[in-house]
Amino acid sequence: MAISIQTLRSFVKVIALINESDSGKFTAFGLDDAFHVATIGYPDCLFSRDQAEGVLGEGFCDDIPTRDDSQEILRWHNLHNELDEIYETKAFLKKLKIELTVFDLKEIRGGEAIHDFNMPVLKRQHATFDIIYDGGALEHIFNAPQALQNMLLLCKVGGYIIHSNPLNIFNHGFYNFNP
């Protein structure tokens, strides 16, 4: 599960679309209220400082902490030869005025909302998120129709669901989603 530079660009575009539809004009990240984003699994920020600042502007990353376990995570993603460090995801997104809720089966990084997406989400969670991001979890959930329904139920009317699932990676998860 990751936020790639392409995903970061998608977040910026979706936030611009939501801002535009709410106010009639693009206001970038100057909102008073945070965007509420839910992810299925903990998303590691898998992009470099130069890539992030190419999208968000020079100096954006100056005060964002990096993870103490960056090298371990980079090895797990097989990116230890490409990136030097990983930004702390919640801190990075908070600077974009994104309030992150991570749904997962168990607490791994800390602060996850524990839920099995094979089962229906709670009614009190319906329509509470502006953006739902699946960066590579759906193919690992056995009951894919229920997981998709959960994502739809969690998303506010007018919100967005972003999927970034692997294509043609055999023996990766339960499913291999294709066009």
Each language-model region and where it sits:
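N-terminal accessory regions of S-adenosyl-L-methionine
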Residues: 1-107, 179
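Generic preference for flexible, low-structure residues
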Residues: 53-56, 114-116, 148, 177
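Short, intrinsically disordered, charge-balanced linker/junction segments flanking boundaries
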Residues: 172-179
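Conserved SAM-binding loop
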Residues: 29, 37-40, 72, 81-172
